[in-house]
């Protein structure tokens, strides 16, 4: 990244930015090839909560090196698990019991220190001088502690899932206004794109009612597959909740949903091709969105 930005920024008038996103990865298969797996029985018991802590350890190394620091593993945050890291007493007690057995303790500990995952001597990156003003960092995490922590080092924007509830989105904006690193300037609502599935039907030969019904059917099938992939089971309640976040319908319906649900300053990241391998249809949907939905939304906002 430093090399790329050094070359990219050779032109002093260059304004195009490099946007780099990083996250822990939602699925196990993303992390396993890189050795991010439980190393002990304690880590295995704590794994759902521990993965987020590993992300913060790795993020600190990544960001401090980008900042130009000389660091070693002794300078990186330590991972200490307590009850606060777990959703229930039962989950925490399982980890405590694993620690008692693994470490031959006489009683359940109140805190469990996890050895550093990344052990290294003094390290820095070169080149040290590059156009950091052309770098935009985005963390894919919904954890408020992680969002706050990474911004103690460098300006890091955040990213939300298409199924994130409006309440969580608004709370994130409020928090980021307080914790966003000052070197990044004032936090703006557009700094966190609002991700949304778009199930738009503007197909020829259908009435507006038929387009609406077809879009609903496409959305139900796709969102059911999405939750099945995430959790291994289809939960109708969660499918309905995801549908409430998605944009579904004909041109007029999608435009109306955007105006009613979204803040006027939101930046929309529209996801068109989920569960749809018909490239021509995807392109038609994208064209209809830009040529018909967007102008309609703009006119509705102007008249509001």
What is each stretch, according to the model?
Residues 249-303:
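Long, low-complexity C-terminal extensions of enzymes
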Residues 113-169:
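Loop-centered beta-sheet repeat module
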Residues 24-28, 70, 143, 163-165, ...:
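Active-site-proximal loop/turn and secondary-structure-junction residues that shape catalytic pockets
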């Amino acid at each position: 990244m430093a090399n790329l930005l050094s070359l990219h920024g050779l032109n002093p008038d260059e304004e195009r930015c490099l946007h780099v996103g990083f996250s822990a990865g939602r699925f196990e298969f993303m992390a396993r090839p890189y050795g991010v797996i439980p190393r002990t029985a304690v880590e295995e018991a704590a794994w759902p909560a521990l993965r987020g802590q590993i992300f913060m350890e790795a993020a600190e190394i990544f960001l401090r090196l980008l900042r130009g620091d000389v660091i070693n593993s002794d300078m990186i945050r330590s991972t200490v698990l307590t009850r606060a890291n777990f959703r229930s007493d039962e989950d925490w007690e399982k980890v405590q019991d694993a620690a008692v057995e693994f470490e031959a303790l006489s009683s359940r500990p109140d805190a469990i220190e996890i050895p550093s995952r990344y052990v290294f001597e003094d390290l820095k990156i070169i080149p040290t001088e590059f156009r950091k003003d052309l770098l935009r960092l985005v963390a894919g995490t919904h954890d408020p502690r992680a969002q706050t922590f990474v911004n103690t080092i460098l300006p890091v924007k955040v990213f939300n899932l298409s199924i994130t509830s409006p309440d969580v989105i608004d709370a994130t904006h409020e928090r980021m206004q307080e914790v966003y690193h000052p070197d990044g300037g004032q936090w703006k609502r557009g700094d966190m794109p609002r991700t949304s599935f778009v199930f738009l039907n503007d197909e020829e030969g259908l009435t507006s009612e038929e387009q609406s019904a077809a879009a609903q059917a496409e959305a139900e099938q796709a969102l059911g597959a999405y939750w099945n992939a995430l959790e291994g089971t289809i939960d109708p309640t969660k499918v309905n909740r995801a549908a409430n976040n998605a944009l579904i319908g004909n041109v007029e319906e999608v435009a109306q949903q955007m105006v009613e649900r979204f803040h006027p300053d939101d930046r929309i990241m529209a996801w068109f091709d989920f569960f749809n391998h018909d490239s021509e249809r995807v392109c038609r949907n994208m064209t209809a969105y830009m040529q018909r939905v967007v102008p309609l939304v703009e006119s509705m906002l102007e008249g509001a």
